[in-house]
């Protein structure tokens, strides 16, 4: 009889009670050809420990929030103090005001902010607000950019970069996505064509300023500025989805790096310090349309709850300390440089890149440009799966998809990074 691991046993049990055995599809490890995911028992610093007591260097960080590492002592202490005073009030609390003030202080283009419970809620609310403010219905999103699982975002571009929305999940009526237009990331011609065809109907463009849901694809020079310009020319709003990049690639998010001003910004992940949270914010004149100040409805039972707000406040306090992002960037660059040098030493088709505490791994030559979702699909996805399995078996926990970015924390040590590079070097040598 086969000896099964505790993770295998738990996964089999989970599938009896939870669809697919997980509460978010990527966690099942299906996209990397694994039979079962690893069930985690606890985490500390840069490490995960599974139910079989295997230890992993974690480069997912709960998909981005754990920029301080797991179980940061200061964040835990702040949460524990708040727990004694209540978990949720269903009423306003001072922590909401304090976190809002901190976000507005640090993010260059947010004058007012509203808290929700997830990134999906944030993007849904931002789109509703943009439509109400402009009195228009159509939105533009980019192929490969993910903005949550709301019906209007579950759209693929079909056979071309320029298309009317077609749902790519059962249960999404075509009527729901008929106003979702899809363009190709880094392709201004597709954007211009959409504005020419639907000039006075487009409420907004929503974009990840750095596309972290098709690995990690940077905007080409001037792309974001051109989006800003075409929105201005057509009285449309520009929304930056910084759920992933906000407080992760820089203290002021990607918008502070590229110096482009969105009208609205969505946030999540880091601002909750590991607790469920999302937010949307922007120009005051737009945000004043949100109920109860204005007519655009948005509400949430647990929105602004004191536990999430407390975790967020302490996290932002720590990452806003002088030198934090310099140190984080050095760690990410050391990892990326080491991986690139290892691949080059064995003439292996691979390259990596990073910004702040976020990185991307591409299984193709660095001479091949990866600027779009289509480009990413042409890389060696099968080799990524082999790399993932090898690293996992040797104690390195990477994102279980070639389409996901990786994350490093301030808790990762030089030894962690060196071990990761050495393992990758061995893989490149053997393959």
Curated annotation (Swiss-Prot):
Q: Which UniProt keywords apply?
A: Cytoplasm, Isomerase, Porphyrin biosynthesis, Pyridoxal phosphate
* GO molecular-function terms, A-Z: glutamate-1-semialdehyde 2,1-aminomutase activity; pyridoxal phosphate binding; transaminase activity
Spell out the coiled coil positions from the record: none
Q: N6-(pyridoxal phosphate)lysine is carried by which residues?
A: 269
Q: Which CDD domains match?
A: OAT_like
**GO CC aspect terms:** cytoplasm
Catalytic activity, EC: 5.4.3.8
Listed under catalytic activity are: (S)-4-amino-5-oxopentanoate = 5-aminolevulinate
* Known cofactor(s): pyridoxal 5'-phosphate
Reply yes or no: does the keyword Nucleus apply.
no
User: Whom does it interact with, and what assembly results?
Assistant: Homodimer.
Write out the similarity annotation.
Belongs to the class-III pyridoxal-phosphate-dependent aminotransferase family. HemL subfamily.
Supply the name of the protein: Glutamate-1-semialdehyde 2,1-aminomutase
Gene that codes for this?
hemL
């Amino acid at each position: 009889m086969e000896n099964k691991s505790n993770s295998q046993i738990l996964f089999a049990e989970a599938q009896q009670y939870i669809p697919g055995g997980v509460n978010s599809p990527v966690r099942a490890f299906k996209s990397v050809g694994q039979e079962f995911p690893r069930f985690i028992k606890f985490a500390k610093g840069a490490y995960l420990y599974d139910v079989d007591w295997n230890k992993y260097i974690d480069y997912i960080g709960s998909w981005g929030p754990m920029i301080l590492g797991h179980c940061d002592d200061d964040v835990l202490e702040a949460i524990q103090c708040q727990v004694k005073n209540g978990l949720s009030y269903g009423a306003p609390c001072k922590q909401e005001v304090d976190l809002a003030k901190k976000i507005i202080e640090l993010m260059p283009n947010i004058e007012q902010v509203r808290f929700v419970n997830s990134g999906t809620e944030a993007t849904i609310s931002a789109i509703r607000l943009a439509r109400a403010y402009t009195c228009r219905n159509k939105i533009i999103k980019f192929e490969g950019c993910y903005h949550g699982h709301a019906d209007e975002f579950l759209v693929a571009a079909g056979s071309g970069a320029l298309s009317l929305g077609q749902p790519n999940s059962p249960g999404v009526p075509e009527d729901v996505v008929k106003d979702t237009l899809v363009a190709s990331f880094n392709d201004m011609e597709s954007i211009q064509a959409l504005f020419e065809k639907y000039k006075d109907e487009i409420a907004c463009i929503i974009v990840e300023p750095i596309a972290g849901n098709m690995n990690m694809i940077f905007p080409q020079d001037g792309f974001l500025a051109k989006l800003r310009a075409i929105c201005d020319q057509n009285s449309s709003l520009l929304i930056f989805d910084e759920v992933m990049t906000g407080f992760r690639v820089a203290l002021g998010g990607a918008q502070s790096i590229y110096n482009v001003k969105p009208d609205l910004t969505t946030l999540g992940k880091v601002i909750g310090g590991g607790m469920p949270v999302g937010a949307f914010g922007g120009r005051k004149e737009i945000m004043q349309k949100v109920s109860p100040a204005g007519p655009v409805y948005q509400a949430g039972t647990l929105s602004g709850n004191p536990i999430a707000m407390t975790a967020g406040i302490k996290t932002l306090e720590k990452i806003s300390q002088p030198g934090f992002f310099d140190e984080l960037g050095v760690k990410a660059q050391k990892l990326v440089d080491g991986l690139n040098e290892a691949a080059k030493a064995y003439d292996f088709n691979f390259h990596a890149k990073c910004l702040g505490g976020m990185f991307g791994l591409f299984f193709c030559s660095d001479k091949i440009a990866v600027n779009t979702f289509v480009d990413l699909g042409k890389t060696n996805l099968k080799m990524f799966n082999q790399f993932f399995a090898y690293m996992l078996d040797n104690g390195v926990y990477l994102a279980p998809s070639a389409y996901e970015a990786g994350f490093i924390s301030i808790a990762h040590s030089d030894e962690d990074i060196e071990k990761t590079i050495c393992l990758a070097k061995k893989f490149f040598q053997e393959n």
